[in-house]
Each structure stands twice: as C-alpha cells, then as structure tokens.
C-alpha cells in the first residue's frame, strides 16, 4: 500500500531519527543557461526538516540528536529511507549517527 504524504510536516521522527530534505543543485549555469534536469546531479547536502527526541541508552542516559531543525548537513550518497511527498518532492529519514557532518554557517 503506497500513500503519498502531502508535506514533510506530517512526519514526526521517533527516537534518534532525523528527517532531511536534499538541497537541489543549481539548474542554471553562470552564463544563464538552464540545464536539463537529468544533467543536474544530486548533492549530498541537505536541510534538517524534523528531529526525533532522542533515546535512552543501556545505562539510562538520555542521548539527544546532534542536529536541530534548520541545520545544513552532509548526508551519505546512499542509505536512509526515502519518503515521496505528494508535490513530487522527497525527504529522507536517517539515524542521527548516519549524518556525516553539520555545515557551519558563515
């Protein structure tokens, strides 16, 4: 059964899950030419859309995710659970530990 969700706001990650949306590469060159969609590569850069509350480890310590909503992060090329949205967008659900890096804002 396949159900398309209308927006990422209807997805609430559990435990240490992080919901991200891939940042789209520029489809326009510096000279103003538009590139065909198939020639625009997918970036490994994403924006955090939602974050789970964390989890309790075996010692009873609360482990919270290291990212927050709005952070720019680097994600692995493969992995995560892709979720299709009704507006032809998609979001990806990762574990916090699978996020490669947080991008510092200048």
From Swiss-Prot:
Residues that bear N-acetylserine: 2
Q: Which Pfam families match?
A: Cpn10
Which GO terms label this protein's molecular function in UniProt? ATP binding; metal ion binding; protein folding chaperone; protein-folding chaperone binding; unfolded protein binding
User: Which BP terms in the Gene Ontology apply to this protein?
Assistant: chaperone cofactor-dependent protein refolding; chaperone-mediated protein complex assembly; protein folding; protein import into mitochondrial intermembrane space; protein refolding
InterPro entries listed in its UniProt record:
Chaperonin_GroES, Chaperonin_GroES_sf, Chaprnonin_Cpn10_CS, GroES-like_sf
* Post-translational modifications reported in the UniProt record: The N-terminus is blocked.
**Modified residue annotations for Phosphoserine:** 31
Task: Name the keywords, alphabetized.
Answer: Acetylation, Chaperone, Mitochondrion, Phosphoprotein
**GO annotation, cellular component aspect:** mitochondrial matrix; mitochondrion
* Cellular compartments annotated: Mitochondrion matrix
Q: Could you name the domain of life of the organism this protein comes from?
A: Eukaryota
Location, primary (coarse class): mitochondrion
Q: Which family does it belong to?
A: Belongs to the GroES chaperonin family.
Q: What additional remark is attached to this entry? A: Present with 149 molecules/cell in log phase SD medium.
Subunit info here reads: Homohexamer.
Kindly give the HAMAP family that the UniProt entry links to this protein: CH10
Report the protein's function: Eukaryotic CPN10 homolog which is essential for mitochondrial protein biogenesis, together with CPN60. Binds to CPN60 in the presence of Mg-ATP and suppresses the ATPase activity of the latter.
Q: What's the protein called, per UniProt?
A: 10 kDa heat shock protein, mitochondrial
Q: Which organism is it from?
A: Saccharomyces cerevisiae (strain ATCC 204508 / S288c) (Baker's yeast)
